[in-house]
Curated annotation (Swiss-Prot):
Record's protein name: Crotasin
Coiled-coil region list: none
Principal location listed in the UniProt entry: secreted
Subcellular location: Secreted
Keyword field: Disulfide bond, Secreted, Signal
UniProt GO cellular component terms: extracellular region
Organ and tissue specificity: Highly expressed in pancreas, heart, liver, brain and kidney. Expressed to a low extent in the venom gland.
Signal sequence bounds: 1-22
Length: 63
């Protein structure tokens, strides 16, 4: 029964760091994490702190 307490604590900590609570670096750059190619009007700047299958998309600013 002791293993259930440890397992539930581990799962709680694992879900605490899921997306929505993560990606501060991408959001600080006015970006968002996207799993497919970035939408039009945005450009990819790499993975940053997104999940392994996502890239950080930021708006393209016209000059």
């Amino acid at each position: 029964m002791k293993i259930l307490y440890l397992l539930s604590a581990f799962l709680f900590l694992a879900f605490l760091s899921e997306s929505g609570n993560a990606q501060p670096q991408c959001r600080w750059l006015d970006g968002f994490c996207h799993s497919s190619p970035c939408p039009s009007g945005t450009t990819s700047i790499g993975q940053q702190d997104c999940l392994w299958y996502e890239s950080c998309c930021i708006p393209r600013y016209e000059k």
